[in-house]
Amino acid sequence: VEFMRSDIQMWKAVRTPIHQDELFRAYAGIKLMPGAREAVQHLLDQGVFVAIVSAGVDLFVSSVASMLKVDDWIANGFVFDDDGFLTDEGVCRLHASGKGDVITKLLAMNGHEAVNCVSVGDSEMDLSMHVEGSRFIGFNPSRDSSKEAFASAGVPVVVEKDLRASLPLMG
């Protein structure tokens, strides 16, 4: 929760108070990355369970999840007071380095085996989703540390910024 408090304090240092409507508007104009809609739809058409596991905020992730019509999603969240203003607290549902716990729970809740799980992520923190028996695809890493971590982990990496390029690696 500390990282969320820190982010909220940085925002409030620039502007306070911040109303939830402002945050909704800020996230309303998001665009999907190239190939996201097509890749997810292809997986859903094949009967694949698709979930978004993000250490981002629920306002953003819920919008993306809705646009893509995924089966499930989880993200951290904001807390607003009774008048709709952002408080200093956040809701921490998962840590960036603890996504593997979420993957394990999703697999158990939905009756899936790790051997049938493929996680896709763009940073070294996402490697935590590579639970035992599963597969992982590095996707368009931007930081050198992520590129190095993916190479050390021996996972395939898609360098194009088009999610469809990950489909052939999913098997």
Regions found by a protein language model. Name each.
Residues A65-A96:
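Histidine/lysine/aspartate-rich catalytic loop segments that bind and position anionic ligands
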Residues R25-R37, I52-A55, A75, V91-S97:
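Conserved beta-strand/loop elements of the cytosolic catalytic core of P-type E1-E2 ATPases, chiefly
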Residues V1-L44, F49:
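A metal-dependent, Asp-based hydrolase signature
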Residues D81-D88, S145-V155, L167-M170:
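Short, charged, surface-exposed secondary-structure boundary motifs
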Residues A36-L68, D72-G77:
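Substrate-recognition element of Asp-dependent hydrolases with the DxDx(T/V) motif
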Residues S54-A55, N116-V159:
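Acidic, Mg2+-coordinating phosphoryl-transfer loop and its flanking beta/alpha structural elements
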Residues A75-D81, P141-S145, K161-A165:
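Short, acidic/turn-prone active-site loops that include or flank metal/cofactor-
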Residues S97-M129:
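Conserved Lys-Pro-Asp/Glu-containing loop-to-beta segment of HAD-superfamily phosphomonoesterases
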